[in-house]
Amino acid sequence: MNEFQPVNRRQFLFTLGATAASAILLKGCGNPPSSSGGGTSSTTQPTAAGASDLEVKTIKLGYIPIFEAAPLIIGREKGFFAKYGLDVEVSKQASWAAARDNVILGSAGGGIDGGQWQMPMPALLTEGAISNGQKVPMYVLACLSTQGNGIAVSNQLKAQNLGLKLAPNRDFILNYPQTSGRKFKASYTFPNANQDFWIRYWFAAGGIDPDKDIELLTVPSAETLQNMRNGTIDCFSTGDPWPSRIAKDDIGYQAALTGQMWPYHPEEFLALRADWVDKHPKATLALLMGLMEAQQWCDQKANRAEMAKILSGRNFFNVPVSILQPILEGQIKVGADGKDLNNFDAGPLFWKSPRGSVSYPYKGLTLWFLVESIRWGFNKQVLPDIAAAQKLNDRVTREDLWQEAAKKLGVPAADIPTGSTRGTETFFDGITYNPDSPQAYLQSLKIKRA
């Protein structure tokens, strides 16, 4: 797939009536934004035509302080959402469980209208599978990023030099109860979703059954640092900056990046309560247009230093720029020897990748998370088989709204995907996933519960 084109100036002006099109793909302008999560945006964008015609002017989005949240924070702080008439409140969530509970409430009940989600949380909320049977229909509107996740291992295991391929360490991990008095302990931030899937795939590819051979725990991202320091966990899967901070603080090392496991994989997604979207179609498109501009801004190398400064703010990540900026610039240390990849594309990407669109919510990619749920026997009551997964995925993932927003924004037609897949996806262990044949993928896996 060809690299994306910058939004055409004439198309943009014609479509939106804005006074300047340069905000889409230019370097950051103005003074660096404050770290405040409230108040007015520090950068003012030209107001787009139609911005005053929205059904609602406010929305509350939840986020977890990892890089997947960057487009939401940048969209607010750089004024991209305000440009389209929306006052977006970005609300830091203490955990994924808190985000789940708050979206059940909705903003009218003191919660949130949606935000950043691990997959397939929106689909599971839709069916009430993770909300005590209470169905909260959700729509998946866009992918927020690719990559930006890693698996960190304690320095106590530095001599073993765990890496992308675990087969050489299989016996060590299987014999851990005999050598250490307990099973090898690994953690993720929320069960049955992204980071659980990444670490399960990593172990299973190395011939280690994550349900039988090790102990898996749920630990919020911000608590992983202390848990690894005190020896509660041996490794964990979560989003940066936490794996890189483990290495920076010399508590552990990054054994593998999820981008090595599945190059340019889908990461977390923007999803909203379906009732909010259905009630506010114009505001939904405005939100998506602001998000798309924010994602394009985030993808520019020249903006990464300012981006790190914004995200480092106390009300956002509260992590030093010295930790954030190298990751955003692809200077990521991997392995027990701390080798620096020094590859911009190895870090988080937000708008495009060598595989094409990052932002587009390909149904074939959102389906993978449901298929992986079936692999591990998760939520059988709503995911009994592939057909049920496909039906649920088609209901929740809204490619059509992304396409409509992109056209309204003036994104060139060649840069708006028309299909629901990127073709065959290939994992580091040689396994392939063809979204048109998910059953074949499932059958090809050796360790599974299905």
From Swiss-Prot:
The main location class comes to membrane
Gene Ontology annotations of biological process type = monoatomic ion transport
- Please indicate if the UniProt record lists Signal as a keyword: yes
Keyword presence, Cell membrane: yes
Going by the UniProt record, its keywords in alphabetical order are: Cell inner membrane, Cell membrane, Ion transport, Membrane, Signal, Transport
Membrane topology according to the record: Peripheral membrane protein
Post-translational modifications: Predicted to be exported by the Tat system. The position of the signal peptide cleavage has not been experimentally proven. The N-terminus is blocked.
The stretch of residues making up the signal peptide is 1-36
Which domain of life does the protein's organism represent? Answer: Bacteria
- Recall the GO molecular function terms of this protein's record: bicarbonate transmembrane transporter activity
As for subcellular location, the record says: Cell inner membrane
One Pfam family in the UniProt entry: NMT1_2
A GO CC term? plasma membrane
What induces the gene encoding this protein?
A: By carbon dioxide-limited conditions, probably via CmpR. Also induced by growth under high light intensities. Repressed by iron-deficient conditions.
Q: Describe its partners and assembly state.
A: The complex is composed of two ATP-binding proteins (CmpC and CmpD), a transmembrane protein (CmpB) and a solute-binding protein (CmpA).
The record's similarity note reads: Belongs to the CmpA/NrtA family.
Its job: Part of the ABC transporter complex CmpABCD involved in bicarbonate transport. Binds bicarbonate with high affinity.
Protein name as annotated: Bicarbonate-binding protein CmpA
What is the source species? Synechococcus elongatus (strain ATCC 33912 / PCC 7942 / FACHB-805)
